[in-house]
Amino acid sequence: MKDELFKQNPKKQFEFDKSVASVFDDMINRSVPFYRENLELCGNLLAKILPTNASICDLGCSSANFLIFLANLRKDFKLFGVDNSASMLEVAKSKAKAYGLDISFFEANLCEFDFFICDVFVANYTMQFIRPPKRQELLDKIYKNLNSKGILIMSEKILYEDAFLSKNIIELYADYKEKQGYSKFEIAAKREALENVLIPYSQKENLNMLEKAGFKKIESIFKWANFETFIAFKD
């Protein structure tokens, strides 16, 4: 379905409810620049470097796009998805079933989730929705539950510290969304709905959190304006 949620009756505050879940795939493909290309980059990299039967847990898996891509790349992967939205998980499970894929899903608040040891954790556009006081604690848990030489892939919308640059990047992003078919009204309405829900950090703040959690080797593998993907290695 096409995302027209903010066309007439803007939501007071953004949440991943049934209305969002029903249009999520269209929404994210039109709202996150190079979403599919970045998803494939990360998936192909993991498929290339991970050992047989590697376990991968997608934290904030939404409609399972990344997990489904991974499952089709390597049949030996052990795949898990966690999300706090029942509506999003309903879509994820339906898609996995339609493709005949064996993916385990958990409905949980990530800050309260009973983590288990994995080779890879993925947090694509997830940390930005976690309340700031809880982010470091969550990253600490992720690091603790990674196997030796484990990997975290983390994609985030980021802030620029320079006000002039930030203003112009935000305007370029709005231009991008207009080219994807969103009206100025829809863009403004969604921005208002996301205020105090999606709280981005700067690149430096994200790197500091990763380092504080214990990651020593951190690289940026994708960036477009105010969107960036980090890969961090344990040990």
UniProtKB/Swiss-Prot annotation:
One GO biological process this protein is involved in is: tRNA wobble uridine modification
Q: Check the record and name the Pfam families matching this protein.
A: Methyltransf_25
Q: What EC identifiers does the entry list?
A: 2.1.3.-
Recorded hits in SUPFAM superfamilies, A to Z, give: S-adenosyl-L-methionine-dependent methyltransferases
Q: Which InterPro entries match?
A: CmoA (IPR005271), Methyltransf_25 (IPR041698), SAM-dependent_MTases_sf (IPR029063)
**Origin superkingdom:** Bacteria
Binding residues annotated for S-adenosyl-L-methionine, in chain numbering: Y35, G60, C61, S62, D83, N84, N124, R191
Nuclease: present as a keyword of the record? Answer: no
Q: Which UniProt keywords apply?
A: S-adenosyl-L-methionine, Transferase
What the protein does comes down to: Catalyzes the conversion of S-adenosyl-L-methionine (SAM) to carboxy-S-adenosyl-L-methionine (Cx-SAM).
Summary of subunit composition and partner proteins: Homodimer.
Question: What's the name of the protein?
Answer: Carboxy-S-adenosyl-L-methionine synthase
Which lineage? Bacteria, Pseudomonadati, Campylobacterota, Epsilonproteobacteria, Campylobacterales
